[in-house]
């Protein structure tokens, strides 16, 4: 594509947009492979008895992904989006090999460090590149489709892996599927995906003339998205709590259901139901937030997640109630997930977007670290139901924080992540 033909918009960039949607489905599938089986493998194959030890792989994954998000946000403007996307998929190739050869749980933890880097680079770049392509008018819709594809991939992979693990050796299923996904995605990115630098330049020149044209430094973007700007800090804490909930669903829920007598197949279905609802729902919630604003959906979604977790805590492992809780958690997350990134993107200019989104995604994915540590230690102390109930209370408080701290889109003018008066 030549510079003279560069345009912003979903229709104008339909082919590349669709390709990035497909790539993100593979990103989601890569992590979805572990959803229904890896905690059980920790107990059955490696003899882990402590929930905190089992959840160590989630802590490693979350820490690696969080730090990679932070680096990716800064490197995107320097190295290019496409290049980071390709590197992200190259890093995924050792994951199935480490799982296949693992003589101890330490190797599984190491594999999840590589998986976290893969997710941080590949998912971050598909998010930013879609925003680059469509421009500001369809931002929520673009993010909804992106997250729908990613978590649709998570759901399908989780359900299929749970079913296949009931018929075959669980570790073999992870290895074969993981290598196939990584290899296909890497080839697609190398051969067909194009960079979006020209689209960024077009939006910056068209909609943000007179603002700074260089990306902010991390030392400026980090405090903005962490505490300095009300809208950004509200989104960052909500993202962290949202992924704390996801860590709970990933690591604690399979163990909770297994302790109540659920089979691997039943656990796989419930583990897949939550991200399936989450994934499909985002097709509409992202676009809905373009119409009514970001704040109502974020607040409602956090409160619904809190209610769903409370139901799961009270279910005592009854599959019908657990399934209903999984649906509620999926709907609540669908309301929140794409809308938070859209709210972040509303508040900054195109050149500041990768760094600011990277900081947000750092805090959001630190939820896996906090969730893995907190839920693991708490589950060892007060059992699974009490742990889930405590997290439900934290989610309620997070939703109330957003209600107080996040302004409506009409009240919030787009701003630089770093004020123009500062030197770059």
Listing of model-derived features with the role each one plays in the protein:
Residues 68-80, 281-293, 379:
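Helix-to-loop junctions at the C-terminal end of transmembrane segments
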Residues 173-190, 388-403:
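Symmetry-related core transmembrane helices of the 12-TM Major Facilitator Superfamily/SLC fold
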Residues 83-97, 179, 296-311:
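Structural signature of the two symmetry-related core transmembrane helices
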Residues 1-14, 195-235, 419-424:
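Juxtamembrane intracellular "pre-TM" segments in multi-pass secondary transporters
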Residues 62-70, 155, 275-283, 368-369:
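Residue-level signature of mid-helix packing/kink "hotspots" within the transmembrane helices
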Residues 11-62, 231-234, 238, 242-260:
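Helix-loop boundary and gating motifs at the non-cytosolic
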Residues 295-340:
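C-terminal transmembrane helical hairpin of 12-TM major facilitator-type secondary transporters
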